[in-house]
């Protein structure tokens, strides 16, 4: 058990990931309140202190011990060469529940078709180290310039190509850019300072947090269904349910009936409930799931 002196310093990503991160934590059971222009959210957990900071800087600060743990992308761990413990993969991003990609992109009219066509060219990017390593792996000599933002507008006048992050590619297409290659796929990770990870209390706190966050991600797009069904024809009814796991079946006072509970993808419910009703199920109700722990 912890005492009031035990506090875990947690870094949360500010910017594009902030809203989706706070929503994920809320689903995991941690409720933050962020005041306007404040970088210090309040939290309904006396054992946590949180600070909002850019994901690009997170791994460095966790490595240095400014934070015990934090959330940042795999890309920024690689870019900053941070020496941290990678506790858990948390596959979510600002607009979806899938990884993002760092891609090599050029103007639609560019003759560049592969990385080897970049010999002697100029590239703009926010991930200079990742890009230089990518060029070195492919034996290409090109200049790489750090971009402070709005990287998509730089080709062709200010750069021959860019290395930029994308979820859907829509921003690149809107700026008339074409993806040549994917350099790196990245997802959010929960990371820990190495010394903090060796502290038993902090490690348990971080591991518990990781479990709950992963459970919240697992529950995305899932709902629970409960119903009563007659034993007659039960096997056929069960076979019609596209469940993640075998349904839980419990006996009722009426020996001719059973109670069924199951977790399914929310997208199938609008078709599934009418099918279940026609198959003889009664008292069907649907409920939300915040966490699904394997």
From Swiss-Prot:
Pathway connected to this protein: Amino-acid biosynthesis; L-histidine biosynthesis; L-histidine from 5-phospho-alpha-D-ribose 1-diphosphate: step 1/9
InterPro entries, alphabetized: ATP-PRT_HisG_long, ATP_PRibTrfase_cat, ATP_PRibTrfase_HisG, HisG_C, N-reg_PII-like_a/b, N-reg_PII/ATP_PRibTrfase_C
Main location: cytoplasm
CDD domains, A to Z: PBP2_HisGL3 (cd13593)
Keyword hit for Transferase: yes
Protein EC: 2.4.2.17
GO cellular component: cytoplasm
Compartments in which it is found: Cytoplasm
Gene Ontology molecular function: any one: ATP phosphoribosyltransferase activity
Any single GO BP term: L-histidine biosynthetic process
Signal sequence residues: none
Cofactor(s) listed in the protein's UniProt record: Mg(2+)
Tagged with keyword DNA damage: no
Annotated catalysed reactions: 1-(5-phospho-beta-D-ribosyl)-ATP + diphosphate = 5-phospho-alpha-D-ribose 1-diphosphate + ATP
Mechanisms controlling activity: Feedback inhibited by histidine.
UniProt keyword annotations, A-Z: Amino-acid biosynthesis, ATP-binding, Cytoplasm, Glycosyltransferase, Histidine biosynthesis, Magnesium, Metal-binding, Nucleotide-binding, Transferase
PANTHER family attached to this UniProt entry: ATP PHOSPHORIBOSYLTRANSFERASE, ATP PHOSPHORIBOSYLTRANSFERASE ATP-PRTASE
Its biological purpose: Catalyzes the condensation of ATP and 5-phosphoribose 1-diphosphate to form N'-(5'-phosphoribosyl)-ATP (PR-ATP). Has a crucial role in the pathway because the rate of histidine biosynthesis seems to be controlled primarily by regulation of HisG enzymatic activity.
Similarity section: Belongs to the ATP phosphoribosyltransferase family. Long subfamily.
Name of this protein: ATP phosphoribosyltransferase
Phylogenetic placement of the source organism: Bacteria, Pseudomonadati, Chlorobiota, Chlorobiia, Chlorobiales
